[in-house]
């Protein structure tokens, strides 16, 4: 996991929040001396934070295997490049030399919770997915670059950002699928592979990937992408990222004609597992730290069919029912020890949450307890569309270090509240901090 806000990452953020111990003010400095004093340095900080966030998560993905990536950013002006166009640069900033990325989906949106919905729908729709990366970026510098409609940049008036840089990258895996679809068929071979060791299927996959990703001419992804832009009425521009998973998979039938598929058992290649993993790739997967478990999101409608907010008493009842549904996603008998939420843009919505939790029994966390209720809009600042993943990231850190499940609840632009639970791993490596 790579959680970055401002200059801090992962448990640096959590430790600062805990040290501040104030649910009404930010841990972040309010001194201009602690922030970039020029546009160049501002962009440098943005690039460093982006690369660090992605590196902390993606370097644990399995090398030489194309990992699908979801990347979300705030809204942009029509002439600004889409988020997927940044994947190549982010990979380079993160120094991920043997990591292959697939553009699974991207979005410019005001609703960061959709990335969690898309992730779960993706795993449901594709039973051969072993792992995927989800990424959100936001902040004053990002919105300035994106020329986000309605955003007014104030950097020239004050270098203390109205929105801190906030980047979150999560590597989400399904070990049950690796155990069932990959581990029994893994092939024993050397780790000393490069583009010339073409006797191995893993090398053939590497070479075919780059041939297709960097290809030019009528049958290339670049040509396909340009045609797609024209069809959508968009001024064609060069694509500098990674090819889409959808297009890549249309190329695989030709690739499968070239592989040997030698190894134990009857392995059948699939769109997301195009060749057998090697035993050392399986070890890479096994050695990645398990930070916790992400539970299925529960949506709670707080508005009627016409978008009009429900009355407070109705919101309380809806949240109480949704809370119980979310608790039911946890292992039997487990209840969350803390809750992360965000009152940015709507301080009043804390009232129905408070009442719903109070009516849910003594085991529910209290927003009034500084060690149980975490308003990240106050404790950090406006993290925009990154807020849902910031909450999840902090919940993972808190649960890992202090035990117990953590709840996150995000009030979305469509009048829905989405509750996501995270729970700690059952076994932790002693004397290892996986957030560093």
PLM regions: where:
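Conserved "HGTGT" condensation-loop signature of ketosynthase/thiolase-family condensing enzymes
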Residues: 1-400, 406-436
């Amino acid at each position: 996991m790579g959680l970055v806000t401002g200059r801090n990452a992962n448990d640096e953020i959590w430790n600062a929040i805990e040290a501040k111990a104030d649910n009404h003010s930010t841990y972040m400095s309010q001194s201009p001396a602690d922030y970039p004093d020029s546009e160049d340095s501002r962009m440098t900080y943005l690039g460093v934070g982006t690369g660090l966030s992605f590196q902390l998560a993606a370097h644990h993905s399995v090398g030489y295997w194309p990992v699908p990536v979801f990347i979300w950013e705030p809204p942009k002006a029509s002439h600004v490049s889409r988020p997927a166009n940044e994947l190549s640069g982010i990979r380079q900033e993160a120094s991920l030399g043997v990591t292959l990325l697939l553009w699974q989906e991207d979005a410019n949106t005001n609703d960061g919770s959709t990335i969690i919905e898309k992730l779960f729908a993706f795993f449901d729709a594709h039973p051969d997915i072993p792992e995927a990366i989800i990424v959100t970026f936001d902040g004053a510098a990002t919105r300035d670059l994106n020329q986000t409609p309605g955003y007014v940049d104030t950097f020239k008036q004050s270098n203390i950002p109205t929105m801190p840089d906030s980047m979150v990258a999560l590597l989400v895996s399904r070990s049950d699928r690796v155990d069932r679809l990959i581990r029994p068929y893994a092939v024993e071979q050397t780790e000393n592979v490069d583009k010339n060791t073409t006797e191995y299927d893993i090398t053939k996959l590497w070479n075919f990937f780059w041939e297709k990703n960097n290809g030019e001419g009528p049958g290339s992804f670049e040509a396909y992408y340009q045609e797609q832009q024209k069809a959508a009425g968009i001024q064609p521009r060069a694509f500098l990222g990674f090819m889409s998973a959808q297009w890549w998979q249309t190329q695989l039938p030709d690739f499968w004609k070239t592989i040997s598929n030698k190894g134990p058992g009857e392995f059948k290649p699939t769109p997301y597992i195009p060749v057998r993993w090697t035993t050392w790739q399986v070890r890479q997967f096994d050695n990645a730290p398990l930070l916790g478990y992400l539970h299925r999101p529960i949506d709670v409608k707080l508005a009627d069919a016409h978008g009009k907010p429900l009355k407070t008493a109705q919101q309380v009842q809806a949240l109480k029912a949704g809370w119980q549904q979310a608790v039911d996603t946890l292992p039997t008998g487990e209840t969350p020890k803390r809750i992360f939420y965000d009152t940015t843009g709507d301080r009043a919505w804390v009232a129905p949450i408070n009442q719903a939790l109070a009516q849910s029994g003594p085991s529910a966390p209290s927003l009034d307890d500084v060690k149980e209720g975490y308003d990240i809009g106050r404790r950090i600042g406006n993290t925009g569309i990154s807020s849902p993943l910031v909450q999840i990231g902090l919940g993972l850190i808190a649960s890992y270090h202090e035990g117990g499940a953590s709840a996150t609840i995000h009030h979305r632009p469509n009048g829905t509240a989405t509750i996501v639970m995270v729970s700690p791993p059952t076994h932790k490596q002693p004397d290892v901090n996986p957030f560093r």
